[in-house]
């Protein structure tokens, strides 16, 4: 379960930004999860709640967004998007020579803070 490690690192970054902007607490966090990141969203939500306990982000609303993986098809020379690792064929030409160009793992997209 690597979700706990991802959440711990995300919390470090969230706390840094909260301190930088004088936040009393974090009220919302938006995370983008890459299609091929092997992150289980329910586990991520559970771990996030767990690591945030006792921090400036305790009780904040977690918003999760799943991102499609962008790939380059060597066969038809087109950019295509895939939703899952199980589908490894180009949806346009059905070729199997795909190169992942954007999956982005896990990204913090937005942090909402309360400064009062």
From Swiss-Prot:
GO terms for molecular function: nickel cation binding; zinc ion binding. Ni(2+) binds at residue 2. Keywords: Metal-binding, Nickel, Zinc. Signal peptide: none annotated. The keyword Repeat does not apply. GO terms for biological process: protein maturation; protein modification process. It comes from the Bacteria. InterPro entries: Hydgase_Ni_incorp_HypA/HybF_CS, HypA/HybF. It holds the Pfam family HypA. Zn(2+) binds at residues 73, 76, 90, 93. Belongs to the HypA/HybF family. Involved in the maturation of [NiFe] hydrogenases. Required for nickel insertion into the metal center of the hydrogenase. This is Hydrogenase maturation factor HypA. It comes from Escherichia coli O6:H1 (strain CFT073 / ATCC 700928 / UPEC).
């Amino acid at each position: 379960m690597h979700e706990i490690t991802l959440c711990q690192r995300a919390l470090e970054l969230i706390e840094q930004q909260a301190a930088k902007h004088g936040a009393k607490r974090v009220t919302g966090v938006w995370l983008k999860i890459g299609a091929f990141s092997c992150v289980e969203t329910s586990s991520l939500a559970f771990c996030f709640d767990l690591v945030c306990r006792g921090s400036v982000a305790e009780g904040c609303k977690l918003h999760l967004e799943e991102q499609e993986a962008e790939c380059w098809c060597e066969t038809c020379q087109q950019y295509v998007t895939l939703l899952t690792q199980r589908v490894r064929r180009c949806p346009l030409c059905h070729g199997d020579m795909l190169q992942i160009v954007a999956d982005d793992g896990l990204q913090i997209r937005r942090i909402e803070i309360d400064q009062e």
